[in-house]
Amino acid sequence: MGMSAISTETLSLGYGDAVIIDELNLTIPKGEITVFIGSNGCGKSTLLRSLARLMKPRGGSVLLEGRAIAKLPTKEVAKELAILPQGPSAPEGLTVHQLVKQGRYPYQNWLKQWSKEDEEAVERALKATKLEDMADRAVDSLSGGQRQRAWIAMTLAQETDIILLDEPTTYLDMTHQIEILDLLFELNEKEDRTIVMVLHDLNLACRYAHHLVAIKDKRIYAEGRPEEVITCDLVQNVFSMNCQVTQDPLFGTPLCIPHGRGRCIVQEAAFTSHG
């Protein structure tokens, strides 16, 4: 593993009396796509929020390129790291252009108002997300995929090297899921952005991630390249699900086929669990 964009040292998180993450040590590789996986309630989203300083740790620390993030000025953090939470909502009537402009907040102060540089950053973000022709449309009039692209455009206008996204494909149909993940993959591939995501679809996580982090029992259960990490045993232990793990015929990445009930149109189906 190369340089780290973000890391944690004995990080502990919780709500009230509940411990969600316990003394977790994590390294997010710089310039790669990292995906958190795990069962519902395992702490994936909580961990992601803490990496963006949206949640105060009970113990330990989060380091942004080696610096304690808790000690950094808010605008300095916002120039280096952007986060898109799950299911964000925009005020009624807000246009795509107005939303994307919000990404320039870290660069504004009473001395420096809106500039040509800011407008150019917004235009680049709209172009990258293919929203130039929709800039004057209200965000709430867009389809689910278009709306999610508008929010991603806002994070792009922020011009950070690190982007965190909490379940960016939730509530999207298959076409729009691939559209969003392809966009993020392209940002990583062409601009070397560090992308950190929470995803529920294990097969899409395996396709797009360079680095997979499986979380269970408040800690990291396994991490590494998907092809090194994903086994039937891991899926059983992390998700309590029996499955067959094979190879994606298009991409060569791990493909998880869950056991269970359903129509069977092959003469013989061997539902055996093995690692």
Curated annotation (Swiss-Prot):
Q: Which SUPFAM superfamilies match?
A: P-loop containing nucleoside triphosphate hydrolases
Q: Which InterPro entries match?
A: AAA+_ATPase, ABC_transporter-like_ATP-bd, ABC_transporter-like_CS, P-loop_NTPase, Siderophore_ABC-ATPase
Q: Primary place of residence? A: membrane
For the biological process aspect of GO, one term held by this record is: iron ion transport
| Family classification | Belongs to the ABC transporter superfamily.
Q: What does this protein do?
A: Provides the ATPase subunit for at least 2 ABC transporter complexes; YfiYZ/YfhA/YusV involved in import of the iron-hydroxamate siderophores schizokinen, arthrobactin and corprogen, and FeuABC/YusV involved in import of the catecholate siderophores bacillibactin and enterobactin. Probably responsible for energy coupling to the transport system.
The molecule here is called Probable siderophore transport system ATP-binding protein YusV
Instruction: Specify the species.
Output: Bacillus subtilis (strain 168)
Upper classification of the source organism reads: Bacteria, Bacillati, Bacillota, Bacilli, Bacillales
**What would be the name of the gene that encodes this protein?**
yusV
